[in-house]
Structure formats: C-alpha cells, structure tokens
C-alpha cells in the first residue's frame, strides 16, 4: 500500500498572516509520522499561480533539509495546467529550489487538455529530479495524477494515460458531492488498470478496508495529522 499526503491550505512563510513557517510545520509533522508518505501533493485552491510557485519553492527547500525523506512532490496546478504547458520548457532554468516530480490534474483539467499536452508537460522547466534521492537514476519519469469523482472522469484519465487517480469522496461529502462508499469505489476501480487511491474522510484504520476494495493505497489532507 502506498500513501499520499495532500497539503492543507498552507501559504508560504512571507504570506502567512499567523506568522511562523506553516510549510515547515506541516512537513515536520509528516516527517515525524510513523508512516512515511510516498508522495506529497502540493495543493491550495486559494493561491494564484505565483503564490503557488512560492509555496512549492519553500516546500522543496524544506524537504532538502530532511535527511532520509525520499518523498516525491507532485504539484496540483489548481486547474492552471495549460499555463504550465505554455510556459516551458526553458533550458537550464528551474524556478523551484528542487523542482517537482510531476503534476496532478483536476477533474476540470481532464477535459481541457489533450494527451500530447502531457508530453509537453514532461519537458516543463518546472520538473527537476533530485538524483541524490533517486540513486543516480537519470531516467526517472514524470508522474501524472488526476482527481476523479465518477466513471466518466476515470475513463478520461485512462485515455490520457495518467499514472494514478484520486477517487473521491469516499466517506465524507465534498463540495456537495455525496460519498461514494466502498462498494462503489471497488466497482469503479475494477473498471480500470490505473492505480486508484480513495480520498475523503479516511484515516489509517481504513487501510485494510481499502486494500480489500482494490485500492492502491490511501490519500488524505488530514491523514498525517493522525497516528497510524
């Protein structure tokens, strides 16, 4: 089972109204947790693109200071994937301190981009592989994920060839969408070869249930605020 941590609505330090270093504080909790995530998705729907870029820079700078923490960072573009496609690549330039390992598409993105757009994203100047963490492997692939809420979304994600999907909500309502429940999750996940991660109201006590229902792992925003 793999685990995906999704950032809460944190801002980078210079914009935090409460002071302190919210990105560092969040990542420290994740780092000290008894279960290590395989991926962290940087997500904050309240930030514009420039603010999101600054947040990712701070997250990567913080991750580089954390020994033996080989988590991969994925950027949720807040529906601005086309902007990221149009910006790059720029030879020899990476705006992020350590770069990112991939992009997470919103359910809106799924229908606004084409498969060839993903090929352009793979050349993005936002991508940078930390070869010290990846043991010298210079062929580490760009990761693409997607948020899905129904069978139509999953079919489109499969057409684009994404590497994983977050299927939600499972146990709690999300933006007016009623919870799918485990029975529906299993039914939908068995219709695709894409690894599917349940999201929405989950904690570590749901791991065995998720595994029984064909989940590749579990994902959550508050997941790593809980004990395993």
Predicted regions and their residues:
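Short alpha-helical segments enriched in small residues
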Residues: 182
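Conserved donor-binding loops in enzymes that form glycosidic bonds
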Residues: 200-201
């Amino acid at each position: 089972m793999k685990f995906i941590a999704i950032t809460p609505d944190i801002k980078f330090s210079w914009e935090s109204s409460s002071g302190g270093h919210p990105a560092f504080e969040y990542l420290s909790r994740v780092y000290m947790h008894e279960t290590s995530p395989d991926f962290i998705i940087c997500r904050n729907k309240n930030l514009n693109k420039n603010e999101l870029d600054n947040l990712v820079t701070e997250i990567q700078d913080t991750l580089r200071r954390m020994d033996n923490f080989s988590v991969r960072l994925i950027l949720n573009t807040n529906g601005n994937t086309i902007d990221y496609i149009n910006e790059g690549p720029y030879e020899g330039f990476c705006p992020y301190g350590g770069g990112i390992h991939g992009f997470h598409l919103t359910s809106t993105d799924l229908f606004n981009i084409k498969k060839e757009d993903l090929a352009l994203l793979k050349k993005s100047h936002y991508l940078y592989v930390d070869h010290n963490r990846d043991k010298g492997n210079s062929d580490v692939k760009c990761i693409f994920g997607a948020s899905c809420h129904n069978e139509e979304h999953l079919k489109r994600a499969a057409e684009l060839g994404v590497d994983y999907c977050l299927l939600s909500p499972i146990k709690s309502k999300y933006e007016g969408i009623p919870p799918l429940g485990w029975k529906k999750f299993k039914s939908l996940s068995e219709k695709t070869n894409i690894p599917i991660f349940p999201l929405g109201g989950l904690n570590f006590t749901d791991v065995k249930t998720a595994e029984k229902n064909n989940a590749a792992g579990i994902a959550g925003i508050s997941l790593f605020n809980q004990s395993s």
